[in-house]
Swiss-Prot record:
SUPFAM superfamilies: Subtilisin-like
Organism name: Drosophila melanogaster (Fruit fly)
Regulation of its function: Inhibited by phenylmethanesulfonyl fluoride (PMSF) and butabindide, but not by peptidase inhibitor pepstatin, EDTA, nor bestatin.
Keywords: Aminopeptidase, Cytoplasm, Hydrolase, Phosphoprotein, Protease, Serine protease
Its biological purpose: Component of the proteolytic cascade acting downstream of the 26S proteasome in the ubiquitin-proteasome pathway. Efficiently cleaves Ala-Ala-Ala-polypeptide and Pro-Pro-Ala-polypeptide, Val-Leu-Lys-polypeptide only at high concentration. Does not cleave Ala-Phe-Pro-polypeptide nor Pro-Leu-Gly-polypeptide.
Domain Peptidase S8, residue spans: 107-608
Region annotation (Disordered) ranges: 62-89, 1139-1190, 1255-1274
Compositionally biased intervals (Low complexity): 1139-1155
Name of this protein: Tripeptidyl-peptidase 2
Gene name for this UniProt entry: TppII
Gene Ontology MF: a single term: tripeptidyl-peptidase activity
Chain intervals with Basic and acidic residues compositional bias: 75-85, 1265-1274
Lineage, uppermost ranks: Eukaryota, Metazoa, Ecdysozoa, Arthropoda, Hexapoda
Active site: 131, 359, 549
GO biological process: proteolysis
Length: 1441
């Protein structure tokens, strides 16, 4: 059947799952229209990396594939053949669907195994799923095969994302009423109170937003549904009404708005702002998060959790749920999200378990799904599941060190307590920079080596280039089973709707061996796609997913079958015997890329036979540690230039028993094995025999690559027990050698073209053909251009899709550091060009693959051209401003047109910790058995943002490290001034920017380890905040040093031949730094430098550039925000004596500052701690020279007295005020300072509707409380009247007409103009504040007297007087403008002013006022939303890690 065949033209769309930071995403691939009429081609690892598989070979493969499944009954086989023929027919309806291939099992012998051993179906086996969470209500995951026993026996969120702080205890009153952390009143019914077994009947309260407990897509669906149900109708009605009012006003007042009278103008403004308010809430609705009150108390059946999903406080109608480990309860929060709970630390922490993606449920379904139809069962349908969520929802489902360690700790605990975890499946991973060390890897080894858990991990979806295996399985020891992804013909038909079945193969994107240190990361391959169950929140029963994430659970399920059988036969096993069995019995696929399949395709039947046949083998309970050289590499890997000499290696081999520390000493003493060592290739040599007892032996291995042709070459040294050769090798030493092509040095343009037997120099590609070329990148090359074209005749506009993957390995860097992955469309009419960055002197792998499902044969002609321009002088890409002019010596690989450009795009601020505190973590889930307490070092940092900016935050010493890190966690959380969580980051946060509003922020960084002394060493670790500049800073180049000094003729472009050109860069001027508005304390600027004029080269050949600024200058500051002067080192200080809400300020640092009268909103933005306030009254900033005279003394004493007016109690303040006024009757500042004192002591509510609502509270009929309320109102009235009198004094003593005349001047030519301006500004600010204070007091008095309309004339007069000097939005006037809008009933204007105040400083009072505004307008749906926003925006404490 495979001899010759032809595929019909058709288009097909497939989906491939890629892993990005632990989160799976689907990428659609549209495949071309191509015909196939040639035999199949496959990779074989020769120089050209491609060979033809002959027709007999393909026939042999087909026959072997059929033989592997021939244990079924003949009748079944005939029926299957007939079904296959009918499916391939051009007409007719097929009544049977190939359901068995939806969750494939036949390929690996699982079906035959279960048919032979139906009782070995995974019973008595538990699989831990380290993933994004498992839905126990998904189809097939509810129960075991008996239909009764729960399948998902435990659910844990190990990430901390679902943690709720429940430390606060409250006791209900006699009616069961308590106050939740949301501020809502909650009522416990007598039934609930009776369940409470707490001795004091106390309950614990907490607050939780569930927004990060489910994927963003599902969160959007929830928001969309809620919006449709509760928002759209009232909001659309309100919007229409607001629009209608505007139309009516315009029809009644025709003409230009600017020509309207003043009262009509503000009315029009109000209507416009009402509509603007409605539109703004419509835009932000999707970002609003809902937080729920959580109540927790003990009962006779364990802890009971109540979540007030009603938001009304009626706990009888709220969600009730018990601990999952006791009750296995899962409850729906809404139509999408279901949760379970666990309780830790005696009730102090409530763990709410959700799911950060559907991935974990899909994985579990493959491993252990149990369905009514056995065709779609998982591999081990009767195995139990323990769900361990390691994907943190705060990080978009990426795994964290904290989650991994907690998950491993829980596995250890369960094994220790007799609830054994037999298998771990981990379809997660990243790429580590090195694998021979790291705390996470060490603990993984401990789980396997000490607790005997078989750990299965996905190899990764990062192929087809070599050295792309992820971590895990690439850790310090090869203790894990790594799995590659395979696709069978049956899967192609059933899962992908392909019109023809191609021969089985690995997926193009599955990661490839070797590990960077030479080890083997891929143990076996298995089916890597399935249409399996997904969580209910997807609103789908099943979905197609593919990737090594799907291959790993297939193997994990298969291991569960093996262990189930071994347990029932009472055969002792270990993770080592399991791994060796599946390795030596795997079906080697000779036509498949050997670097992708490991030992071959998993064969469950043969693996079980091997385990039972060799049950008495003395090596079943031990592993063989293989370490190469001093770095303890797992294998030998030569990829460092051209190999011209043989190399000798010392390889250390050590047998280690399972749980070595507790192993029987007699077993160690008696152990001896005599080994025969066999190298698979003649260019690898070693001794033939090794006698090995329980201890370390070393052998010498010589690798002689001198005779190897360019390409990749692999070999392996296998060690066989001479007493039992048939059980296969006990261990292997993998060897990989890469010999690169070296381009001729005399070439004008270095170009690589592959050798080809075709006349047109093309290479033939079939589906999944992989062509690898290894080229030594020439010196001075910085980028390469790949040119491709199809040479097949008569192709017309037909195109081919090629997966191009280039990779260069750099020391102590992951494979992702310098690589390019791209799917390129290639046609026959025009060349397709792909450019990418390269590193000179390093071997480049150019890997071109035809996608696995891409029908048709193509002949591809391609070439690789190297180009480059770079600076070669030391520290060329780092410039220090303090060193002046920076020099660049640039050279080109070939003749290039040079047009350098240097753009600095980010400003980097170093943040030093303000606090570092080491403390023990949870005593229940952060203690590694036995008794190894994990500690945290919690570092706190302050970040001030002067204006809204995009900011990235990272910890340099922990950045880009996870599995290889010495510490197990480096998570940080960014909080605003109200302790609301704004952003979260971890190992890879340096590339993620967050939009931050103006304000002050706190960053908390948690670093974890079990050794306190190590944590102490990082107490001074700093963070870096990277601010995106609003516009990049571009630096100029000069060809002449002197021209650079004077800023003369600039260098633009010129041709660069085979010579060196010197260019100079001048430091950035202070003026430009000031205009750039850099953040305070900026340490350096970062950006990119490009040299080539060629546009393609400019996109890819970018050199990271760092510009180090001069140290910050310390000097006096003025009110306002930092403008980035002094190399962005200077900052502004907030010098306000008053605050926006009238709170009593701190004492000023100097007497002179006491007379400062500033705007109510001052003090927001960037500030420097410990800087003294600045006197805005015009008093000198420093003492006068010489001895002080009597006038100086009097003035200083006056200023000191004024400073005490603000600080003292009101009675004392009045006395000091009287003294100041008596001595200095014209000193108007004293009046305003006394007003501030009165406001801070007696007037708490400053915003209009808040104040009004406080006065509307109905007084009691009689009694002591009524008298007290009347007395309080009397005090308020007295205070307001006093404010009016004090303000009147200032207003009467200030000549407003003179001020207006002065500010009407265009130019003041008087000699003392500056002094006059200072004095006039002082008078203006004093007058504005007095007018504002009086206006607010008058409005409040009118509210108390319920005669606001009678006071409108006076309020309007004060308002019009203020706006003669400043705009109503000005911070000096906005508080009174808010009251003026209230007096007129202009709620739209009120909204606008409150939003302006929020931009300056976000407080709960502002949100309360917004809610009241919408309540007054009748917008109850908006009021409800604002109340929700307040709960989330103003938490009582920082969120838990």
């Amino acid at each position: 059947m495979f001899n010759r065949f032809r595929l019909v033209h058709k288009q097909l769309r497939l989906y491939k799952n890629f892993g990005l930071l632990g989160q799976k995403a689907s990428v659609g691939l549209t495949l071309p229209i191509i015909s196939l009429s040639r035999p199949y081609m496959a990779y074989m690892g020769t120089e050209r990396s491609v060979v033809m598989i002959t027709a007999p070979a393909t026939k042999e493969f087909a026959e072997s594939s059929e033989r592997s499944n021939s244990s079924k009954k003949t009748t079944n086989k005939e029926q299957s053949d007939k079904s296959a023929e009918s499916r391939m027919a051009t007409s007719g309806i097929v009544e049977s669907f190939p359901t068995g291939a939806l969750v494939p099992k036949a390929e690996t012998g699982v079906l035959n195994f279960l048919q032979k051993y139906p009782e070995y179906d995974g019973r008595d086996v538990t699989i831990a799923i380290f993933d994004s969470g498992v839905d126990p209500r998904a189809t097939g995951l509810e129960t075991l095969c008996d239909g009764k026993t729960v399948k998902v026996i435990e659910r844990y969120d190990c990430s901390g994302c679902g943690d709720v702080d429940m430390k606060k205890k409250v006791t209900p009153d006699e009616n069961g009423n308590i106050k939740g952390l949301s501020g809502n009143s909650l009522k416990l019914s007598p039934e609930l109170m009776a369940l409470n077994t707490d001795p004091e009947k106390a309950v614990r309260v907490g607050l939780k937003s569930f927004s990060d407990l489910l994927p963003s897509k599902v969160r959007n669906n929830i928001v969309a549904q809620a919006k449709l149900k509760h928002w759209d109708k009232p909001h659309k009605t309100a919007t229409a009404n607001a629009s209608r009012k505007i139309v009516e006003f315009e029809s009644q007042n025709p003409g230009e708005a600017s020509k309207l009278p003043w009262d009509k103008k503000i009315l029009k403004e109000n209507l416009d702002f009402e509509l603007e308010m409605l539109n703004s809430y419509e835009k932000v609705y999707g970002d609003i998060k809902t937080s729920y009150d959580c109540i927790l108390f003990p009962t006779a059946d364990g802890w009971l959790t109540i979540v007030d999903t009603t938001e009304q406080g009626d706990l009888d109608q709220a969600l009730r749920i018990g601990e999952y480990s006791r009750t296995h309860e899962t409850r729906n929060v809404d139509d999408f999200l279901s949760i379970s709970v666990n309780v830790h630390d005696e009730g102090n922490v409530l763990e709410v378990v959700g799911m950060s993606s559907p991935h974990g449920t899909h994985v579990s379904s493959i491993a252990s799904g149990n369905h009514s139809s056995r065709d779609v069962d998982g591999v081990a349908p009767n195995a139990k599941i323990v769900s361990m969520t390691i994907g943190d929802g705060r990080l978009g489902s990426m795994e964290t060190g904290t989650a991994l360690v907690r998950a491993m700790t829980k596995v250890m605990e369960l094994c220790r307590d007799g609830r054994r975890i037999d298998v771990i499946n981990m379809s997660y991973g990243e790429h580590a920079n090195w694998s021979n060390s790291g705390r996470i890897g060490e603990l993984m080894n401990e789980v396997v080596n000490k607790y005997g858990v078989v750990w299965v991990a996905s190899a990764g979806n990062h192929g087809p280039a070599l050295c792309t295996v992820g971590t895990p399985p690439d850790i310090s020891q090869p203790s894990l089973i790594g799995v590659g992804a395979y696709v069978s013909p049956q899967m192609m038909e059933a899962e992908y709707a392909m019109r023809e079945k191609l021969p089985g193969n690995v997926y193009t994107w599955t990661s490839r061996d070797p590990c960077i240190d030479g080890g083997q990361g891929v143990t076996v391959c298995a089916p890597g796609g399935a249409i399996a169950s997904v969580p209910q929140f997807t609103m789908s029963k099943s979905q197609l997913m593919n990737g090594t994430s799907m291959a790993a659970p297939h193997v994990a399920g298969a291991v569960a079958l093996l262990i189930s059988g071994l347990k029932q036969q009472n055969i002792e096993y270990s993770p080592y015997s399991i791994k060796r069995a599946i390795s030596v019995t795997a079906t080697k696929l000779g036509y498949v890329d050997p670097f992708a399949q490991g030992h071959g395709l998993l064969n469950v039947e043969k693996a079980f036979e091997h385990l039972t046949e060799h049950r008495q083998s003395k090596d079943n309970m031990l592993r063989f540690s293989v370490r190469v050289g001093n770095n303890a590499d797992k294998g030998i890997h030569l990829r460092q230039g051209v190999q011209r000499n043989s190399i000798d290696y010392n390889v250390y081999i050590e047998p280690i028993f399972y749980n070595d520390k507790e192993a029987d000493p007699k077993d160690k003493f008696n152990f001896n094995v005599r080994l025969n060592l066999i190298a698979s290739q003649p260019w690898v040599q070693c001794g033939a025999f090794l006698d090995l007892s329980y201890g370390t032996r070393s052998i010498a291995v010589r690798v002689d690559p001198t005779g190897l042709q360019p390409g990749v070459h692999s070999a392996v040294i296998r060690a066989y027990d001479t007493d039992c050769v048939q059980k296969g090798s006990l261990f292997e030493i993998p060897v990989t050698v890469v010999q690169p092509h070296v381009l001729e040095s005399d070439q004008n343009t270095p170009v690589f073209e592959p050798a080809s037997s075709k006349g047109d120099n093309s290479v033939e590609f079939q589906p999944n053909t992989i062509q690898r070329d290894f080229i030594l990148v020439p010196e001075r090359a910085t980028w390469a251009e790949l040119r491709m074209r199809i040479t097949d005749p008569n192709r017309g506009e037909d195109i081919g899709k090629f997966f191009v993957h280039t990779n260069q390995l750099l020391p102590k860097q992951s494979c992702r550091k310098l690589e390019t992955m791209k799917i390129v469309s290639v046609g026959s009419e025009n060349e397709s060009i792909m450019a990418f960055k390269v590193k000179s002197g390093r071997i480049l792998e150019l890997c071109i693959a035809k996608y696995w499902s891409n029908y048709g044969q193509s002949h591809l002609k391609y070439s690789l051209r190297f180009r480059g321009v770079e600076a070669h002088n030391p520290n060329a890409y780092v410039m220090h401003a303090g060193r002046g002019i920076h020099k660049l010596e640039i050279e080109a690989l070939v003749a290039e047109d040079v047009q350098p450009q240097l753009q600095l795009k980010n400003a980097e601020v170093v943040l030093k910790p303000t606090e570092a505190k080491i403390s023990p973590l949870s005593a229940t889930r952060d203690v590694i058995p036995d008794g190894r307490q994990v500690y945290q070092n919690l570092l706190a940092f302050n970040l001030n943002v002067a204006k809204a900016a995009d900011v990235s935050i990272y910890a340099p010493i922990f950045n880009d490290l996870l599995y290889e890190a010495e510490f197990e966690s480096q998570m940080w959380m960014l909080f605003d001034a109200n302790k609301a969580l704004v952003a979260t980051g971890d190992a890879h946060s340096h590339t993620s920017f967050t939009k931050l509003d103006k304000g002050e922020y706190t960053i908390r960084l948690q670093v974890r380890h079990e050794k306190r002394d190590l944590l102490e060493k990082i107490s001074e670790a700093n963070l870096v905040a990277s601010f995106k500049l609003t516009s990049p800073l571009t630096l100029d180049f000069y060809e002449n040093y002197n021209q650079c000094i004077v800023g003369g003729r600039k260098y633009v472009s010129s041709p660069l031949r085979l010579s060196t050109r010197v260019l100079y860069i001048a430091p950035i001027t202070q003026e430009r730094l000031t205009k750039a508005n850099l953040p305070a304390q900026c340490a350096w600027l970062s950006g990119n430098l490009v040299f080539p004029q060629d546009e393609v080269g400019r996109r890819v050949a970018q050199h990271p550039f760092t510009y180090i600024l001069n140290p910050a200058e310390k000097k006096s500051h003025t009110n306002g925000s930092s403008n980035g002067s002094s190399a962005a080192g200077s900052t502004a200080t907030a010098a306000a004596v008053t605050t926006a809400n009238g709170a009593k300020p701190k004492a000023p640092a100097t007497p002179q500052a006491a007379t400062s009268v500033t705007n109510p909103a001052a003090g927001d933005g960037i500030s420097v701690q410990n800087d003294p306030p600045v006197d805005s009254s015009g008093s000198p900033a420093s003492p006068k020279k010489g001895k002080a005279n009597a006038d100086d003394y009097a003035e200083s004493f006056r200023d000191f007295q004024c400073s005490q007016i603000v600080k003292c109690e009101l009675e004392m303040a009045e006395k000091i005020y009287n003294d100041v006024v008596a001595a200095h009757p014209k000193h108007l500042q004293a009046n305003l300072l006394l007003i501030q004192n009165i406001e801070s002591n007696q007037l708490k509510s400053q915003l209009p509707l808040t104040f009004v609502n406080a006065q509307k509270t109905s007084p009691p009929e009689a009694g002591e409380s009524a008298d007290k309320q009347k007395e309080d109102q009397k005090k308020v009235r007295s205070a307001l009247e006093r404010i009016v009198k004090l303000a009147d004094k200032v207003i009467q003593e200030t000549d407003s007409e003179a001020l207006l005349s002065y500010y009407g001047l265009k130019n003041d030519t008087r000699a003392d103009a500056a002094k006059i301006k200072t004095n006039m500004d002082k008078q203006k600010n004093t007058l504005i504040e007095a007018l504002s204070k009086k206006g607010i007091a008058v409005a409040k008095l009118a509210v108390l007297d319920d005669c606001i309309k009678d006071s409108l004339a006076e309020i309007n007069e004060l308002y019009t007087e203020i706006i003669k000097f400043v705009d109503a939005n000005d911070s000096k006037a906005i508080q009174f403008a808010l009251w003026h809008a209230y007096a007129h009933g202009h709620y739209g204007r009120m909204y606008k002013y409150v939003v302006k105040l929020i931009e300056e400083k976000r407080t709960r009072d502002h949100f309360v006022e917004l809610a009241a505004i919408n309540g007054a307008l009748g917008h109850e749906h908006i009021r409800t939303v604002i109340n929700r926003m307040m709960i989330t925006a103003f938490p009582s404490s920082f969120r838990l890690f």
